[in-house]
Swiss-Prot record:
It comes from Homo sapiens (Human). It is linked to Nephrotic syndrome 7: A form of nephrotic syndrome, a renal disease clinically characterized by severe proteinuria, resulting in complications such as hypoalbuminemia, hyperlipidemia and edema. NPHS7 is an autosomal recessive form characterized by onset of proteinuria usually in the first decade of life. The disorder is progressive, and some patients develop end-stage renal disease within several years. Renal biopsy typically shows membranoproliferative glomerulonephritis. Hemolytic uremic syndrome, atypical, 7: An atypical form of hemolytic uremic syndrome characterized by acute onset in the first year of life of microangiopathic hemolytic anemia, thrombocytopenia, and renal failure. After the acute episode, most patients develop chronic renal insufficiency. Unlike other genetic forms of aHUS, AHUS7 is not related to abnormal activation of the complement system. This is Diacylglycerol kinase epsilon. Changing L438M: Decreased protein abundance and diacylglycerol kinase activity toward 1-octadecanoyl-2-(5Z,8Z,11Z,14Z-eicosatetraenoyl)-sn-glycerol. The gene is DGKE. Keywords: ATP-binding, Cytoplasm, Disease variant, Hemolytic uremic syndrome, Kinase, Lipid metabolism, Membrane, Metal-binding, Nucleotide-binding, Repeat, Transferase, Transmembrane, Transmembrane helix, Zinc, Zinc-finger.
Length: 567
């Protein structure tokens, strides 16, 4: 009977049965990975929400990481971990399961003390165990720390000193912290506590408190753009918080410079320094905020400004000796050392006023503040095309090399098209009120600093001609002309000299007809008939680091000194 019920071999019903099995197994093989992937993503989302809830309520500055950059052990369970979370203020590292325990067990850096503490009263060390920096040495026995493959040894989160487990005695646990190598840059929590108490008592004599910290105390404020340098600023914020007081470190995308700089008003007169981590645009934003402090009558609190260049361009930072771009080639601790060694100098800032023709003077002139340069012509056209495409697809322009390749493409295109030709027929140029006759040019560039176009010394050119001395603090502008994009490229590789038009205290340019590309400090726009007037606005107090001086800087300085001697 059973044999009768079975389908005969080769019958249609047996084929259908086999096809059903095949379809079932195919569906399982397709749907099972989909189900597993969906389940894993759901669990991952739940875990992320759980972590975010802990992060939001925590006093630590927790951040996720998928892979620690060095051998790491959980500070709670002491197990070796590859991924987890770390605090970017105190450096604590834990796995995901120990987050809540770490939050309750360990205290983060306190930006100010809870009790009323005098500045003269030193703080005790704040030790955390394990994960000491590589190549660190014990402050007691001077031997290397962190050599054992386990959670061992201690680090003070303020002075960054390390000590072995066996060297950690009761006397050392109670030892006072001197804030280490960067004590002259750190704002002590006890200082802020005393300031807070003085403000309650309606006292403002902060100089008395500061004098107890020493004349060498020049507290540093970090203003970093987390979006600059392919989001490199985000990581720098955490590294600076570990080395300094977290209250000194600001993300300008969340706290505008005008608000962040109010911290300077709690510091001694003329003592504060600011390190701007970002491109030339971020530096200009900070300097505008400094000008607002002058308007408010806060001149005595104005800081000196240093630059850590991120992104592309960075001609101002190059002029001030900070290099063309930071990509982590030196540790952040060395950056702080460079800031301590830097010298104060002045930087001219200029007002660029653009008055459109027509409109019966009903429109207000557009005003810009210039730190680097103003230009009309092919370089402004390249910047305009680049910015237009970057706004459409910003994710495609996250690489410095790619950005420079795009600039090269537009420069090559303009060599063939020559959209800015016959500029001399479209504009009139006046230097200090005197009209200047122009040859057949495609571009005019007005310089305040030595570098232009991502590292080119435009005013110097090939260096084989005598030229007047150029400085960024003499109240003079250098005006040059270029014959086209190909001429710009030749100047950048020192195969040609620019057409030096002259130097002036005031520059006036009249665009008589047609639309032309213009830019101020790398911010381009298309401009119709107008009058552009450039006059001196103010000085900015900057920090110059001579340690980054290049061979070009040395040769340029020596050449100009020789010229000055012959004159």
């Amino acid at each position: 009977m059973e044999a009768e019920r079975r389908p005969a071999p080769g019958s249609p019903s047996e084929g259908l049965f086999a096809d059903g099995h095949l379809i079932l197994w195919t569906l399982c093989s397709v749907l099972l990975p989909v189900f597993i992937t969906f389940w894993c993503s759901l669990q991952r989302s739940r875990r992320q929400l759980h972590r975010r809830d802990i992060f939001r309520k925590s006093k630590h500055g927790w951040r996720d990481t998928d892979l620690f950059s060095q051998p790491t052990y959980c500070c709670v369970c002491a197990q070796h971990i590859l991924q987890g979370a770390f605090c970017d203020c105190c450096g604590l590292r834990v796995d995901e399961g120990c987050l809540r325990k770490a939050d309750k067990r360990f205290q983060c850096k306190e930006i100010m003390l809870k009790n009323d503490t005098k500045v003269l009263d030193a703080m005790p060390h704040h030790w955390i165990r394990g994960n000491v920096p590589l190549c660190s040495y014990c402050m007691v026995c001077k031997q290397q720390c962190g050599c054992q493959p386990k959670l061992c040894d201690y680090r003070c989160i303020w002075c960054q000193k390390t000590v072995h487990d066996e060297c950690m005695k009761n006397s050392l646990k109670n030892e006072k912290c001197d804030f280490g190598e960067f004590k002259n840059l750190i704002i002590p929590p006890s200082y802020l506590t005393s300031i807070n108490q003085m403000r309650k008592d309606k006292k403002t004599d902060y100089e008395v408190l500061a004098s107890k910290l020493g004349k060498q105390w020049t507290p540093l404020i970090i203003l970093a753009n987390s979006r600059s340098g392919t989001n490199m600023g985000e990581g720098l914020l955490g590294e600076f918080r570990i080395l300094l007081n977290p209250v000194q470190v600001f993300d300008v995308t969340k706290t505008p410079p005008i608000k962040a700089l109010q911290l300077c008003t709690l510091l001694p007169y003329y003592s504060a320094r600011v390190l701007v981590c970002g491109g030339d645009g971020t530096v200009g934003w900070v300097l505008d905020a400094v000008d607002d402090m002058k308007i408010k009558g806060q001149e005595k609190y104005i800081p000196q400004v240093a630059v850590l260049p991120l992104g592309t361009g960075n001609d101002l930072s190059n002029t001030l000796g900070w290099g063309t771009g930071y990509a982590g080639e030196i540790p952040v601790a060395q950056v702080l050392r460079n800031v301590m060694e830097a010298d104060g100098i002045k930087l001219d800032r200029w007002k660029v006023q653009v008055t459109n023709k027509g409109y019966y003077n009903l429109r207000k002139p557009k005003e810009f503040t210039m730190n680097n340069y103003f230009s009309v012509g092919p370089d402004a056209l390249m910047a305009l095309n680049f910015h237009a495409h970057r706004e459409k697809a910003p994710s495609l322009f996250s690489s410095r090399i790619l950005n420079k390749a795009v600039y090269l493409f537009y420069g090559t295109k303009d060599c063939l098209v020559q959209e800015c030709k016959d500029l001399n027929k479209k504009v009139e140029l006046e230097l200090d009120g005197e009209r200047v006759a122009l040859p057949s040019l495609e571009g005019i560039i007005v310089l305040n600093i030595g570098y232009w176009g991502g590292g080119c010394r435009l005013w110097e050119g090939m260096g084989d001609e005598t030229y007047p001395l150029a400085r960024h603090d003499d109240g003079l502008l250098e005006v040059v002309g270029v014959y086209g994009s190909f001429h710009c490229a030749q100047i950048q590789v020192k195969l040609a000299n620019p057409f030096r038009i002259g130097q002036a205290h005031t520059v006036r340019l009249i665009l008589k007809c047609s639309m032309m590309p213009m830019q101020v400090d790398g911010e381009p726009w298309a401009q119709g008939p107008c009058t552009v007037t450039i006059t001196h606005k103010t000085h900015a107090m900057m920090l110059y680091f001579s340690g980054e001086q290049t061979d070009d800087d040395i040769s340029s300085t020596s050449d100009q000194e020789d010229i000055k001697a012959t004159e």
